[in-house]
Amino acid sequence: MAIDLFCYLSIDRGAAESDLNKIRSNHSELFEGKFLISPVRDADFSLKEIAAEHGLVAESFFLVSLNDKNSADLIPIVSKILVDGFNGGAILILQDNEYRR
């Protein structure tokens, strides 16, 4: 069973990449095997529509995928780390693009 966190950001791709690199570096114990992070990309029309349904104007987007099934209980912690790590903009995290984290 795949578990993905769909992460929508109100900041541009460059700022998001910078913040995400800091998060990866500060929490390498999570992001070097237990969870995999996709490259940040610009939010396209459909991604912007999904974010708008939840009250966010999305500029960028990335995925966090659970890579180690035994780490599923860490999903709330990973979500908190991401929220805290993006000080420059709002983040919307949807588990499997459906459930708000």
From Swiss-Prot:
- Output the InterPro entries linked to this UniProt entry: CDI_Immunity_Comp, CdiI_Bp1026b-like
Q: Where is the signal peptide?
A: none
Subunit details: Specifically interacts with the truncated CT fragment of cognate toxin protein CdiA-2, which inhibits CdiA-2 tRNA nuclease activity.
Annotated function = Immunity protein component of a toxin-immunity protein module, which functions as a cellular contact-dependent growth inhibition (CDI) system. CDI modules allow bacteria to communicate with and inhibit the growth of closely related neighboring bacteria in a contact-dependent fashion. Neutralizes the toxic activity of cognate toxin CdiA (C-terminal 301 residue CT fragment) upon expression in E.coli. Does not inhibit toxic activity of CdiA from other strains of B.pseudomallei. Expression of this cdiAIB locus in B.thailandensis confers protection against other bacteria carrying the locus; growth inhibition requires cellular contact.
**Protein name (record):** Immunity protein CdiI-2
This chain's source organism reads Burkholderia pseudomallei (strain 1026b)
